[in-house]
Amino acid sequence: MKVRAFITHKLKEHYSECQDRFAINIDRRSVAVSDGMSQSIFPDYWADVLSRFYANNGHCTDEDRINLCQEWQTKVDQYIDREKQEGRNPWRLQNSLASFNGAGATICGVTFDKANHWAGHVLGDSCIIEIDTSNSDQPKVVK
C-alpha cells in the first residue's frame, strides 16, 4: 500500500493560512485528514490533534474529543506563554478563551486491515468515497 499526502492553501491565501492537517500511521495502516475551521481559535492545532489521534488509534469518538480538548488547550497555553515572553500581549486571545470560544475542525479517517478492507470515520462536512474500478469500463462509487 502506498500513501501520499500533502496540504495546500486556497487560491487567494498563503500556505501559512492553511488550517488543514493530516496524519499517517503506517503501522496501524491508518490515515486521517482534518479541515480546521478558520473562524475558530487555533483550528490548525485542533486539526493536528484530531488527525494524529485518529491515525494513532483508529478512532476519534465523542469521548475521545472531549479528552483531547486538554491537549489543544495545552498547545494554546504554550503559545500564550511564548507571546508573553516575547513582550507581546495576547489579550484578544485570552478574552476569546475566557468567552469559551474554541477551535473547530472536521475529521475524516480511514483504517485498513491486512486484507485491505477499510473502516472509516467522518465528522463534519468531510466524506469518504470508495470507487470500484474492477470494471474499467464503468467505474462506480461504492460508498
Name what the model sees in each region.
Residues 1-143:
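PP2C/PPM-type serine/threonine phosphatase catalytic domain
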